């Protein structure tokens, strides 16, 4: 996929999903009833909620648009400069947008899948509104898992920057630690995503908890494994 196409694909997806949503729920009563009981392995109270039809159509696509705009703003010189101040005595070069531009295709891929995740949640909510109570958690879990796999696949390509990745003072100051941490994080994210997809298909109510727990474990594995790998490489 070309860089320009990848850059604008999130907005095209948002527009397409919004239009499709407006079409498929046009005949539903207003307000729309949304039942997400199958999303978790325990019961939610109330069992179902309602929302105005226009909210069901535009709320999550609007959030996806805000996410896309935020990612675009975060790589600006102003945002990077302000972020660098939060880290104290980090190199001034990290405030340069070039630090993001050099892995721009990877950055755009991550943005695309974050937007896809938001739209996947939206699709699950729409499915619940249409009465597909058991399908909704499967959609959300599968899209969440696929997003983790896709982002994990490109995570090792990230380079030290202030926008994307595991950005601590240690990883930003040590290129070797950055590489080892993100290599391990990428593998762990792929495994977490595959597990989330599998659980989401077989036992959909456990898909979201599986994703949350596996993400926490992934962060621990990346932090510990990355540090040990960096030490071993220096030995």
Give a label for each model feature.
Residues 49-68, 134-151, 213-214:
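Alpha-helical transmembrane segments
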Residues 70-136:
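Ordered, amphipathic secondary-structure segments that act as subunit-interaction surfaces
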Residues 125-147, 154-171:
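Membrane-proximal helix-loop-helix units in multi-pass membrane proteins
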Residues 6-14, 67-73, 105-117, 179-190:
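Select subsegments of transmembrane alpha-helices in polytopic membrane proteins
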């Amino acid at each position: 996929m070309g860089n320009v196409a990848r850059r604008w694909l999130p907005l095209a997806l948002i527009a397409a999903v919004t239009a499709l949503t407006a079409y498929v729920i046009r005949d539903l009563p207003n307000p729309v009833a949304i039942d997400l009981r199958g999303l978790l392995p325990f019961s939610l109270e109330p069992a179902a909620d309602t929302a105005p039809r226009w909210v069901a159509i535009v709320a999550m696509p609007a959030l996806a648009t805000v996410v896309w705009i935020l990612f675009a703003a975060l790589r600006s010189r102003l945002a990077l400069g302000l972020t660098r101040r939060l880290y104290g005595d980090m190199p001034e070069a990290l405030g340069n947008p070039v630090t993001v531009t050099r892995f721009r295709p990877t950055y755009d891929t991550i943005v695309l899948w974050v937007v896809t995740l938001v739209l996947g949640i939206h699709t699950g909510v729409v499915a619940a509104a249409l009465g597909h109570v058991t399908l909704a958690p499967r959609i959300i879990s599968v899209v969440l898992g696929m997003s983790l796999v896709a982002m994990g696949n490109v995570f090792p390509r990230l380079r030290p920057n202030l926008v994307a990745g595991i950005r601590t003072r240690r990883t930003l100051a040590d290129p070797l630690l950055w590489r080892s941490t993100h290599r391990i994080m990428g593998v762990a994210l792929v495994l977490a995503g595959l597990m989330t997809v599998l659980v989401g298909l077989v036992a959909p109510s456990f898909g979201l908890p599986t994703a949350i727990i596996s993400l926490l474990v992934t962060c621990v594995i990346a932090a510990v494994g990355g540090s040990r790998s960096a030490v071993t490489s220096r030995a």
